[in-house]
Swiss-Prot record:
Belongs to the bacterial-type ferredoxin family. FixX subfamily. Could be part of an electron transfer system required for anaerobic carnitine reduction. Could be a 3Fe-4S cluster-containing protein. It comes from the Bacteria. It comes from Escherichia coli (strain K12). The keyword Transmembrane helix does not apply. The keyword Metal-binding applies. This is Ferredoxin-like protein FixX. The gene is fixX. Keywords: 4Fe-4S, Electron transport, Iron, Iron-sulfur, Metal-binding, Transport. GO terms for molecular function: 4 iron, 4 sulfur cluster binding; iron ion binding.
Length: 95
């Protein structure tokens, strides 16, 4: 029988090359609150975090580039979603 997979361990193997000068995801200044709440629940990397004051904070570093937030929030919560420029982004390492 195999042991359960620990997602944090699997994600920890990935390498992230963050483009500090050009974020590939930009949250709207007047983002729809319900759309942001949905992104908090849906992001598999947990990059959308609800703060104590009820606001939602986002950090694109660590993005898996899966497109979940693009599908759920582009237009309502997100101003921009594009893949990172060449040589930047996630490098999946399976091991």
């Amino acid at each position: 029988m195999t042991s359960p997979v620990n997602v944090d361990v699997k994600l920890g193997v990935n390498k992230f090359n963050v483009d500090e000068e050009h974020p590939h995801i930009v949250v709207k200044a007047d983002a729809d609150k319900q759309a942001l709440e949905l992104l908090v629940k849906a992001c598999p990397a947990g990059l959308y975090k609800k703060q104590d004051d009820g606001s939602v904070r986002f950090d694109y570093a660590g993005c898996l580039e899966c497109g979940t937030c693009r599908i759920l929030g582009l237009g309502s919560a997100l101003e921009q979603w594009e893949y990172p420029r060449g040589t930047f982004g996630v490098e999946f390492r399976y091991g």
